[in-house]
């Protein structure tokens, strides 16, 4: 059965969007709000009718992620900001595999996200309350699976507890996209042997956004 590279590329762009948001937060103490909202919202729909639906039914919502994916696929340097994006992306993919092999963690994650959905009727998605709840899910369920993702940035920024919470919430959203990527046929071999195909598909999707 032929793989759907549109869905695979879109879900992987979701992972990369989280990577870029983490990088922005770690270095600048802030990030672009529209893609942040899209990424965090993706956490709350665990039974979507399509991959597009996870991201607001509009690939343009993943423009940041698609551009970051192209950068990751093109990255030749192992240093600097490009390397950070690659490590964050790969780190999220590795953690998803750990989650996939742990039924207990999956069940607890589903339960906690259901509770998040209920809170959304009382708080805005980007409120400190919901961001903190998402961060707690990451700390309680994802972090213990290991290996931990080492976030690099400005030390004074990374010591800020609100930034720490946002980073963890965004990493949780990245895990959600990594789960989706696997569900639609994504795999690590594509990052080695289908890089050109993924790059072209990302470019094609971007040209229509």
Swiss-Prot record:
Recorded topology in the membrane: Peripheral membrane protein
Claim: DNA-binding is one of the keywords in the record: no
One of the Pfam families matching this protein, by short name: DUF489
Disulfide bond entries: none
InterPro entries per UniProt: HflD (IPR007451), HflD-like_sf (IPR035932)
Gene Ontology CC terms, in alphabetical order: cytoplasm; plasma membrane
Coiled coil: none
Keywords: Cell inner membrane, Cell membrane, Cytoplasm, Membrane
Location in the cell: Cytoplasm; Cell inner membrane
Domain of life: Bacteria
Primary localisation category: cytoplasm
Protein family per UniProt: Belongs to the HflD family.
Record NCBIfam families: PRK00218.1-2, PRK00218.1-4, PRK00218.1-5
Protein name per Swiss-Prot or TrEMBL: High frequency lysogenization protein HflD homolog
Species name: Sodalis glossinidius (strain morsitans)
